[in-house]
Regions:
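Helix-loop-helix hairpins and the membrane-proximal interhelical loops
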Residues: 1-58, 134, 138, 189-300, ...
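Transmembrane alpha-helix interface/packing and boundary motifs in multi-pass membrane proteins
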Residues: 23-39, 69-81, 156-161, 261-273, ...
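Transmembrane helix boundary and interhelical junction motifs in multipass membrane proteins
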Residues: 33-45, 74, 84-89, 269-281, ...
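Hydrophobic transmembrane alpha-helices of multi-pass, membrane-embedded glycosylation machinery
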Residues: 44-49, 154, 172-177, 282-284, ...
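Membrane-interface alpha-helices at helix entry/exit sites of multi-pass transporters
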Residues: 56-60, 97-114, 291-304, 331-334, ...
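Membrane-embedded alpha-helical modules
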Residues: 109-222, 342-481, 485-489
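Membrane-interface interhelical connector segments
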Residues: 335-360, 385-391, 563-573, 591, ...
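Flexible extramembrane loops and terminal tails that flank transmembrane helices
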Residues: 491-637, 655-694
């Protein structure tokens, strides 16, 4: 084993292999900072070049690209609240709040150091586990998959400071969306409204871009503010001090990174689980065991370490089932296995025997890529942090253009743009009402896999799986324990929950009513499908209807009370709000036993101080949505090459946020050139021929 370990390293000591490793990192980081493209797209585009490359050159380029994508995705998650890849959703929970406080440098340093440290810890574990690859990967069957997905959904419900019922409604909404499309077991088309473009389901990318990127841009456009305020002093000595503090804190609290790395590494061994689940479970476990669990989601370094410690380690773990059994843990590994097949290699025992040093070379590539990620992240941190100082109206056209192009790239039909518009409006609403888009995202991503494995489990074992699968029993017992403990805390604070106040009482009650009607309709439609195709959607619809009715009962008296009391200064969850900047103890009122009870400095950068300011911000947010919808419509009617730059130019010229005509002209020309170049490159790259989009 030791000989193979060192041989695997020396095999990388050729110029082509090292150059392709650096090239892959650079391409991956570029793609990772463009929401909507993703690792699958860039790896797929690399496949044609594989025919002219050696095995080590191919492996070096593709694995380094994956590492670059996932690291760069965390950068946009921190500075823009827009993860470049779905796997980086947990990073937004604490990374973006840190950036809003002016700690982007510290957050980026923690992210870079945690990524490197977690990846190297996983590489050490890899050395011991590669010998046990076969037995470890074959332990998981449909019951285990089903149980671990249930555990993942329950864990995400424990994260953040959002009322438990709202988290479950969000997760159930994500599950309901995941069942749209052709049922993989029976082939029945479910909830498609007879639209062929929905037969393949709802993509994660339009959802993520809508509820994260566009929603954030609309909010920033409405407030006319940047993510944070950065002056030259902060980007000088003060900024470097932030970076040093971030590195030092990561080493001081290394156990948070190590825990996430081990969890993600082990989850990476499970074929089909993917990095999304691994990252969320690592973050959820980190919160459960942390002394600052109640502060997770408010911008604590421990939360960011828990999220980023798993970023690279899960990719290291996914190598083992890919090369030992030919079983991918995610879509990225599907493309990687395809590349090995093109080169004449058959993943499995034959590969391990015929090329025993190859897995170790893969491990070294990931280790080197992790180190490069850390170094590049720290070197670029000052420049990347400047993004947070750009005001919303200036960033708006660029993010809108990327979102429209990215949504179409993911679905490859105009349905991607329609979905983007729908989810953007939904994102603005649910953000104001305090629902969890993260829970909805994990429901959307895991819903299909959960549905498949429930069917397989019941078909193979019936209810006997409880006695045949001890590992599944353990996962289910942990999930049940978490639900019961949350229920006990809710019962303890039940009266406080019933007195819950809301920032928008009437709007919240109307949303509850709409969700209840939607869930009941979903349940009724699901009843019309064959039993195998409709069982899980019907159960999910019933649960969503029950949770929505529960929210109706809670929110109705709150709305009645708000008609007599000015509740404009009460935020979602019924927390008493002090004046901005004041230090105070927050009393949990409406979070059903899962609230924060911490002493913190309140930040309300996005919240207007008066009713007049609030009305002005709401009007600007509505205008922002109209600009976004106009860009989407122009792209559909005129094509990307014309529609995107045209709307960018018009936006810049009529934008009153730019005081002088000269500034408007300069910004209009510059932004039009940038977005026009992006659109032209996009069209040329994908050779689109749909509805004249070339």
């Amino acid at each position: 084993m030791i000989a193979h370990l060192f041989t695997g390293l020396t095999n990388l000591g050729t110029a082509p292999v090292l150059l392709l490793l650096v090239f892959g990192m650079a391409v991956g980081m570029f793609v990772g900072m463009l929401p909507g493209l993703g690792v699958v797209l860039v790896l797929t585009l690399m496949l044609p070049f594989v025919y002219h490359m050696s095995v080590l050159e191919t492996v070096s380029m593709m694995l380094a690209t994956q590492s670059g994508v996932y690291f760069a995705a965390s950068i946009t998650a921190i500075v823009l609240n827009s993860p470049g890849a779905p796997e980086s959703f947990p990073t937004t929970l604490d990374g973006f709040p840190m950036a809003k406080r002016g700690e982007a440098g510290k957050a980026l340093a923690i992210s870079a150091t945690s990524t490197w440290m977690g990846g190297w810890i996983a590489c050490i574990i890899f050395i011991g586990l590669i010998q046990l690859a076969g037995p470890l990967a074959t332990v998981f069957h449909p019951p285990e998959y089903m149980a671990i997905i249930i555990l993942a959904i329950v864990l995400i419900a424990q994260t953040g400071n959002i009322p438990l019922s709202k988290v479950y409604i969000s997760g159930l909404l994500g599950l309901m969306l995941s069942f749209v499309g052709s049922d993989p077991v029976t082939g029945v088309e479910r909830f498609t409204m007879r639209m062929p473009t929905l037969y393949s389901g709802i993509g994660v990318v339009p959802f993520a871009l809508g509820v994260f990127a566009i929603t954030q841009m609309v909010k920033m456009y409405g407030s006319q503010k940047a993510v944070a305020t950065f002056d030259q002093a902060q980007l000088g000595k003060g900024f470097q001090a932030q970076v040093r503090a971030g590195i030092a804190e990561t080493f001081k609290k290394w156990h948070h990174v190590a825990r996430s790395a081990v969890i993600a590494m082990l989850l990476g061994l499970i074929p089909g689980i993917g990095g999304f689940t691994a990252n969320f479970i690592s973050y959820g476990v980190g919160q459960r065991v942390s002394k600052r669990r109640d502060e997770f989601g408010t911008g604590v370094p421990e939360g960011l370490m828990s999220a980023e410690g798993s970023s690279l380690s899960k990719e290291v773990g996914s190598i083992i089932p890919a090369v030992a059994l030919g079983l991918p843990s995610g879509l990225g590994m599907v493309i990687f296995i395809a590349a090995l097949t093109i080169l004449g290699l058959e993943p499995g025992p034959t590969l391990l025997k015929g090329s025993p040093t190859l897995p170790y070379s893969m491990m070294w590539i990931m280790a080197i890529a992790g180190l490069l990620s850390c170094v590049l992240g720290l070197l670029l941190a000052p420049q990347l942090s400047r993004i947070t100082g750009i005001k919303g109206p200036y960033m708006f056209p660029f993010i809108i253009a990327l979102a429209v192009l990215g949504s179409f790239a993911d679905v490859n039909t105009t349905m991607g743009i329609y979905l983007l518009v729908i989810f953007s409006i939904l994102g603005v609403v649910v953000r104001d009402l305090g629902y969890s888009v993260a829970a909805a995202a994990i429901g959307l991503v895991l819903g299909g896999t959960f549905d498949d494995n429930v069917h397989l489990t019941y078909s193979l074992y019936g209810w006997n799986f409880v006695t045949r699968s001890p590992l599944a029993d353990i996962f289910l017992l942990v999930a049940i324990y978490l639900i019961i403990s949350a229920g006990r805390r809710w019962h303890k604070n039940k009266k406080a929950a019933m007195r819950q106040a809301a920032k928008h009482p009437l709007m919240e009650w109307v949303f509850d009513l709409v969700m209840a009607v939607f869930a009941v309709t979903y349940f009724i439609v699901g009843m019309g499908y064959p039993s195998q195709a409709g069982q899980i959607p019907v159960v999910v619809g019933i649960l969503a209807a029950a949770a929505s009715v529960y929210r109706l009962i809670i929110d109705f008296p709150v709305w009645l009370h708000s008609r007599h009391v000015d509740g404009s200064d009460l935020p979602q969850g019924g927390l008493a709000v002090p004046k901005p900047g004041a230090e105070t103890e927050i009393e949990p009122v409406g979070t059903e036993g899962l609230a924060v009870a911490v002493i913190t400095r309140m930040e309300h950068d996005d919240e207007p101080e008066t009713k007049k300011d609030r009305r002005h911000q709401n009007i600007r947010e509505f205008i922002g949505i109209l600009w976004f919808a106009g860009t989407a419509a122009a792209s559909l009617v005129l094509g990307f090459k014309i529609g995107v730059p045209l709307m960018t130019f018009v936006y810049a010229m009529v934008n009153k946020d730019l005081a002088s005509l000269k500034k408007r002209v300069v910004f209009a020309v510059a932004s039009t050139v940038v977005t026009g170049t992006l659109a032209y490159a996009f069209v040329s790259l994908f050779h689109l021929t749909f509805h004249g989009m070339i």
